[in-house]
Amino acid sequence: MVVSAGPWSSEKAEMNILEINEKLRPQLAENKQQFVNLKERCFLTQLAGFLANRQKKYKYEECKDLIRFMLRNERQFKEEKLAEQLKQAEELRQYKVLVHSQERELTQLKEKLQEGRDASRSLNEHLQALLTLDEPDKSQGQDLQEQLAEGCRLAQHLVQKLSPENDEDEDEDVQVEEDEKVQKSSAPREVQKAEESKVPEDSLEECAITCSNSHGPCDSNQPHKNIKITFEEDEVNSTLVVDRESSHDECQDALNILSVPGPTSSATNVSMVVSAGPLSSEKAEMNILEINEKLHPQLAEKKQQFRNLKEKCFLTQLAGFLANRQNKYKYEECKDLIKSMLRNERQFKEEKLAEQLKQAEELRQYKVLVHTQERELTQLREKLREGRDASLSLNEHLQALLTPDEPDKSQGQDLQEQLAEGCRLAQHLVQKLSPENDNDDDEDVQVEVAEKVQKSSAPREMQKAEEKEVPEDSLEECAITYSNSHGPYDSNQPHRKTKITFEEDKVDSALIGSSSHVEWEDAVHIIPENESDDEEEEEKGPVSPRNLQESEEEEVPQESWDEGYSTLSIPPEMLASYKSYSSTFHSLEEQQVCMAVDIGRHRWDQVKKEDQEATGPRLSRELLDEKGPEVLQDSLDRCYSTPSGCLELTDSCQPYRSAFYILEQQRVGLAVDMDEIEKYQEVEEDQDPSCPRLSRELLDEKEPEVLQDSLDRCYSTPSGYLELPDLGQPYSSAVYSLEEQYLGLALDVDRIKKDQEEEEDQGPPCPRLSRELLEVVEPEVLQDSLDRCYSTPSSCLEQPDSCQPYGSSFYALEEKHVGFSLDVGEIEKKGKGKIRRGRRSKKKRRRGRKEGEEDQNPPCPRLNSVLMEVEEPEVLQDSLDRCYSTPSMYCELRDSFQHYRSVFYSFEEQHISFALDMDNRFFTLTVTSLYLVFQMGVIFPQ
C-alpha cells in the first residue's frame, strides 16, 4: 500500500540509498501482486460472462437473491475494514507529528537549561569574587555599587534565559525597568531622590499592557495559537477532532482536522484525545488547509484501491458460486481455475491481517514514545519553573542589596552576611538547574562554597587570630614522602610507600615495599636524626656525612649502637650501585647449626680502670664494650656482621650476594683455643714471630705516637683500599685449591716492621683463621690503622691491579679429609711491673724471655668472636670494626673489586677439624704430601 507523504522533510532527505531501496522493494512486490490480480480478474470476468451465458439457458432465478445478499454484506464488511484502516493510519500519522514536535521542544528546553546553568555559574563566581575581596576598603563606596550592578545585570540575564519564548516581550519590559533601577541605584542618592519625586504615578501602569504576571511564571509556557490547549495543574490536554462521514462516496472529507473554538463545542464526530505537550511555534503555524492538501492524494489513492478490492471480491464470490454450481455438471475444465481463485483469496486475507498487526505494533511503539517524552517534558518544565523562581528571588535580593534604605548598614558585617546569602541563593539556583546525574558534583561544589562563605562571613580579626595560633609543627604534616638531605645521590629515586612519624623530635622512617631488587634500591639510608636540628640543617644545606657523624657524636652520646646490627646498612652518600647485598648472609642449609645470640650491654664509660669482659663471638655476634679513658668511639660496628660499603665507593663493588658461610650437608666443629694475651707497657726483648698466611695472623704494631685511626675496618673480610690499580684482577681461580691430594702448606710470613723508632721486633702471632685481634696497650700509642683487611685477602695502598678478584673459594678442600691441628702458642709481651689479675697459662712459654710476670686473661677464641677491650690512655679510636666480619670496600675503589662472590669457606661433604698450633709459626698437616711456601713479599710486595 503506497502512501504519498508529501514533500520530504529534512530527516528524509538525509536517508541514504540503501534505506530507500529497502522501502521501495515492498512497493514493487505489491505492484507485481496487483498485476497478477488484475490478470486473474480479467480471466474471471471472461469466465463469469461465460457462466452467465450458460446460466441464462437454465434460468437459475433462485440464486439471484442470494447473490445480492452476499454482495451487500461483502460491501459493508469491506467498508468497515477500510474505515478502521483509515482510522489507524490517521492516528499513526498524528502520533508521528506529535513525536517530532516533542523532540524539538525537548531540544529547546535542554538548550535553555544549559544556558541557564552557564549564566548561574557565572553569577555565582561573580558573587564569590565580590564576597572574598582582598582589600576590604575597596569593597565599599562606588566600586561596590558598580559590582552589585553587574551582579544584578547577570541575574536579569539569567531570568531572561530561563523564560520561554512567548514571554520575551514581557521580559523586555521588565528588563527595561530593571536597567532603570540599576542606573538609578548607581547614581548618587540625592539625584535618585530628585528623580523619584518627578516620576508620575501613572508610569507604574505602563507595563500593565501585557498578559504577563511576574509572580506566576508557571503560566509562561502557553502557546497563543488556534489549537485548543487546556492547562490543568501543568498538564496539557490536546484534543484533536477528526471529521469523518459514514458514507463511502464522501471519504475525501475523512481526514479534516478541525479546530475547536471553545470548550463547549459539540463532539459528535469521531475524536481521538492525545495527551501531549504544546506544539512548537512552527507546527502551530501550519493551517488546516495545508494538511488537507497533503492528505487529498492519499485519500484518492485509498478510494481507488477500495474499488479494486471490491470488484475483486465480487468476482471472487461470483466465481465461487458459479464453481459450486458447476460441480453439479462436472465442468472439469474449470477445476484448476477455481482452486487457484480460492487459494488467492486465503492468501489475500492473511496478508491483510499481517498488515493490520504491523500497524498496531507501530502505533503502540509511538504511544510509548509519546508518554515517555511527555514525562520528560513535564520534568524539564518543572525544573525551569523552579529555576525562574530562584532567579527572581536572587534578583530581588540583589536589588534590595543595591538600594539599601540605610547606607550605614550596608557596610561591615551586615554587607558580608547579605552577600553570603546571595551566594547561597546562587548556589541553590545552580543546583536546581543541574540535571540529576550532576547532583554529586554539585554537592561537592556546594560544600566548598559553603566553607568559603563561612570563612568570609567571619570577622577578619578572628581569621588573623586563628592564623597566629596555628603551630609551626603543622607545616610538617605534609611531609609524607621520604627525603634524605644527607644523601643527594638518592634524590632521583622513586618514593614508594613511606610513613614518617614525628614523635619526641625523633624521625622514624618506615619504607614499605616488596623484596625485589628494584624496589630494594629505594630503601635508602635509615639514619637516626635528632629532629630538633632539622631546621638548622635545612638552613645550612646538605651536610657532609663525616661532619654529620661528628656532630651526632658530640651532641648525642651513642644514641643507638649498631643500628645496622646484623642487617644491611649503607652509610650516607653511598652511590646507588651498592644496593644489591640482597642475598642470604648466613645461610646454613641442611645442617645442624646452633647459633646463640648474646648481645652484651653497650656502655660508654669515660674513666674506668678495671677490665670488663663481654664476649662477642663471631657467629653469636657479640660485641665487647670498650673501656678507655678519653677514647672517642666514632662508630662502633655500624655494619656489624653484615656487608657494608662506606663513603664514596664506586659502582663495581656491588654483588656481595653469595652466602658467606655456607655449610652444606656437614657438621662443622670449629674450635679455636687462643692463649692469653699479655700486655706490657715497655717491651725490652725482641720477638721474632712468624705470621703465617693461612693462619691469617696479623702482628700488632707497638710504636709510640701511633694514631689508631680505625681498628679492623674490614675485620676478617675481603677488602680493597685506596686507589688500587686495575691490574690485580685475574686471581679469580682458586688461590689455594688443594684437590684430590694431601697438601701441607707452610707459610712463613716475614715480619712486618715500620721505621718509626723501632726498638725491638714485635710479633705475637695472630692467626688468620682464628681472627684474633690483639689488644694494643701502650702509653701514647697512636695506631693509624690496625688490621684494615684482617684475616682476608687484602690489597694495600697502591697495589697493582692484578690482585683484585679473589672470587673463587680461597681454601677449597674437596673430597678429602684434612686435619688441621693448630695450637696457638702463647703471645707474650714484656712490660713493666703492673701485674694484671687473671688466670695463668698452664702451658710453658717456649719463649721465656720476660721482664715482667703478668697474669694473662682467659683465652678468647676467634670463632667465639670475643673482642678484647682496648684499655689505653689517650688512644683515639676513630672507628672500631665498621664492617665487622663482613666484606667491605673503602674510599674510591676501582671497578675490578666486584667478584667477591664465591663461598669464602666452603667445606663440602667432609668433616673438618681445625686446630691451630702456633708454636713454630706454621701449620702442620697430619697427612702431608706437599709443602708449598708462599712469601707475602712475593704475593703482596710492599
Curated annotation (Swiss-Prot):
The keyword DNA-binding does not apply. Residues 190-201 have a biased composition (Basic and acidic residues). Keywords: Coiled coil, Cytoplasm, Repeat. One of its GO terms (cellular component) is cytoplasm. Residues 831-849 have a biased composition (Basic residues). Disulfide bonds: none annotated. Its main location: cytoplasm. InterPro entries: NBPF, Olduvai_dom. Residues 89-130, 339-401 form a coiled coil. Expressed in the mammary gland. Residues 165-259, 436-528, 529-617, 620-675, 676-767, 770-843, 844-904 form the Olduvai domain. It is found in: Cytoplasm. Pfam families: Olduvai. Residues 165-180, 530-539, 550-562 have a biased composition (Acidic residues). Residues 161-203, 451-474, 528-566, 831-863 are annotated as: Disordered. The keyword RNA-binding does not apply. Belongs to the NBPF family. Encoded by one of the numerous copies of NBPF genes clustered in the p36, p12 and q21 region of the chromosome 1. This is NBPF family member NBPF8. The lineage of its organism: Eukaryota, Metazoa, Chordata, Craniata, Vertebrata. The gene is NBPF8.
